[in-house]
């Protein structure tokens, strides 16, 4: 493995790095091959086939880094991909033991410094540390993934810290427009008692650290996420930017549903959001599917958990009448990308979906403008 370049004394923002928006061009997508059957008890056998469909769609116009535990997993993945028609030349297998495959939260988070004069554009990796969503005990293998990625890609690695302690944030807990605004939830990162990621840190310190490591200037807090989310309020089930000035926000129309009040509160709060330039964003309503249960457990089924790749926008669907409605709304917002549904009924039994499994690696080129969505 190449020698690792670790930057500790300076923060990414000081060097001009910022986190690009998801719709900007990708060099690759990172995924972790599913192997922890306890994440999908009773349904694990179907999950590799969902991955096959995801990889087929994503790899149409970008490379895939797929984290596997060993050669057996790699060979199994190759068989699945061959069956569904994936071009294996687009897949780079990365052998690294992991606890789970939720790469949005455990994988490398990339920041980029733009080209300036004789200075070339470059990307680096921020290691926001991971503690199993402050809920599970088996996470120590997962926390090594960003370092492995930095070594493999020969990228500079920034270890996120606050008050000389590792700073914990998951990729699914932050949503950015690539121009300076970040949205998260109080439930996820400001709750002082439940699933506490950074004990002892208050809102001011958390915001300052996010600004230092992601290059954002403007942070806005929604309240809570939908019931069934075992991450305790990840934003990627609630609210997503589709371009620099437009976002979708989920809404529950049934007043008897347990999600009605918390999601309604988010709609009240979003009226106060101002972007980094002081402007007010356009907010588009995204419906919720009917409640989805398995073994009596409510699952965090949400159309907001879509992933924007170069070739398409892949959207979780749930055999629900609102599948078509959600796909239609997103199709109107992403004019220049096909919007494609992927059945996620079994996948969401793992308490996550398409966005939770993916992590984008931005291209070094110029950012795409919102009109190219």
Question: What is the role of each PLM region?
Answer:
Residues 2-368, 373:
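The feature marks the mature, well-folded catalytic cores of soluble enzymes
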